[in-house]
Amino acid sequence: MKKISMVIVAISAMISLSGCHEDPTYVDSYFQRQSVIEELSNELKGQYCSIFIPVIYNASQEQLDYKSLWKGEVTENGQPIIHYTFGGYENRTVTLQQVPICWISFVIKDTKLAEAVKLLPDYDISIPYSFASSDEETGEASKMGKIIYSDSKVPVTLNYGGKQHLVLFNFKCPSQFVFDADKRPISSGRIQLELKSIIVDNVIVQEIDGYSGEEFFLSIMSKTDPISK
């Protein structure tokens, strides 16, 4: 009788323990599948052009007259046009071509650094992109997705103050574009770059947060159809 009681207790304990354990729920995200990532990124691959809208203010809230400084292609009303390239699956980055980062000098407080930055040529800025579900709370393979643009850092070497310095322009890219994978072709959406900080020789010398007056935004409007594939 004692042995039977011990067996019953043991079985009860096992049932109790198994009841406390739940199998993890696997969320099948459509946008985690390699075949989907490859298909979407290769669909975006190509050269594009779009209206380019800079919003640049210094600490005195003076706005940069970018239209008079822009040397590239423009629309009929003088709005700058920027060219950019989407890499495909093997290179999931979008590259903004010939960005006038010399305009950053307008918001820099250090006059010597500002003068050096003003002399910089145009640079290409590369921004990594990825795909994710826009409906991650559900356990369904939703085809509503979003393009996520990552941050980008632009390093330059400058000589000023009698020394050579490594300067890093730290851009945030908060853009996320929601799309339906069943509706093709997908669009890249608006891409926005925000200059958040300037780093010289691994030291942050200026943060651009809007509270002190300086603002540096570059907005590239959405363009659906590529110039070339």
Q: Which stretches of residues belong to each language-model region?
A:
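Predominantly extracellular/secreted and cell-surface proteins with exposed
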Residues: Q79-P174
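Positively charged n-region of N-terminal signal peptides that target proteins for export
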Residues: M1-I4
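Short, solvent-exposed loop/hinge segments that bridge or flank secondary-structure elements
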Residues: Y26-E39, Q47-V99, Q206-F216
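Extended beta-sheet lipid-handling architectures
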Residues: Y48-S50, D65-L69, V99-I101, I108, ...
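Glycine-rich, aromatic-bearing surface loops/beta-hairpins
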Residues: Y149-K229
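Bacterial Sec-dependent N-terminal signal peptides
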Residues: A13-N42, S219-K229
